[in-house]
Structures are given as structure tokens and as C-alpha cells.
């Protein structure tokens, strides 16, 4: 079933991350915020907190279960690929970006865990629901990616 989670978790410091990990709380940040709200963070977040602002890498490093989401329809770009690009290439501070495997895990397995459905979703394995997207481009060049096909419940959406 549903799990305890903190949506956004945008200004978490080391003490908050450790406490969340110890309590088994799932972090659900929105990487698209790094792209879409960057000017607001640069203008309003105090310098001493800036590098902790949506520090996705720190969430993984703290040992949290992390599930990425889009926060749609609040954001203009309800597009996981924009969020993926931001997680990989657009941290607010150098060194806070996450790796490709972490980002894909957070959008798939992490998201399934966060919604309490990891027994059905989040993996391409026998017995799991067949929900996935096929991407064109290079995963190592996220700006080149586009969705070429989606499949939901085993049915392709052409």
C-alpha cells in the first residue's frame, strides 16, 4: 500500500535526510523544478541554503528511496524527459547532479515503491505490468531523447 513520503523535499539538509532515511520516508522531488524554477531559487533562496536546494544527489547519498515526479499540472513542462535532463545536467550547484542509472531508477522502480505498487510496476520482468516508453536518441545525451512509443498494460499506443 501507500508509503510515507515527502513531496518536493526541496531544502533538506543532511540532518533532514538522515532523519527521513531512519524513518523510512520516501523522498519525491521534481527534477523539472531545477529547470523551470531556477530563476526563483537564484533570487530567493539564501546563499547558505542554495546548494541544498533540490540536491537530488544528496538524497541518494543519504540512502533514501527516491521517486522522481513531474508535479503536473502545476509545472508548465509535464514531461519526464525535461526532468531527466535536469537531474542529469542542471543541478543548482556543481556536483549535485545524479547519474543516469539513479535517475532512471527514481522514475521507474522508485516511483512504483512510492505508490506502493512495486509488485506490479517499475521493472521489465515477467509478471510485471507492461507499462513502458521506448526512447529514441542516446541516454548519454539526454537532450537528444524523444519518446517514440508508449505501451500501457501491454497495449502499444501508436
Stretch-by-stretch model annotation:
Residues 1-4, 9, 14-21, 25, ...:
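His/Asp/Glu-enriched, well-ordered alpha-helical/loop segment
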Amino acid at each position: 500500500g501507500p508509503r510515507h513520503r515527502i513531496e518536493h523535499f526541496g531544502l533538506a539538509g543532511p540532518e533532514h535526510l538522515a532523519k527521513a532515511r531512519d524513518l523510512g520516508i520516501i523522498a519525491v522531488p521534481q527534477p523539472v523544478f531545477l529547470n523551470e524554477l531556477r530563476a526563483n531559487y537564484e533570487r530567493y533562496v539564501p546563499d547558505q541554503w542554495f546548494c541544498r536546494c533540490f540536491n537530488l544527489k544528496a538524497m541518494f547519498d543519504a540512502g533514501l528511496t527516491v521517486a522522481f515526479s513531474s508535479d503536473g499540472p502545476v509545472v508548465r513542462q509535464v514531461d519526464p524527459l525535461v526532468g531527466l535532463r535536469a537531474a542529469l545536467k542542471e543541478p543548482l550547484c556543481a556536483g549535485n547532479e545524479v547519474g543516469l542509472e539513479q535517475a532512471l531508477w527514481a522514475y521507474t522502480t522508485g516511483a512504483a515503491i512510492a505508490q506502493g505498487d512495486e509488485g506490479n510496476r517499475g521493472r521489465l520482468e515477467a509478471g510485471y505490468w507492461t507499462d513502458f516508453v521506448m526512447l529514441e536518441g542516446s541516454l548519454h545525451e539526454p537532450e537528444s531523447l524523444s519518446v517514440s512509443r508508449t505501451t500501457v498494460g501491454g497495449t502499444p499506443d501508436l
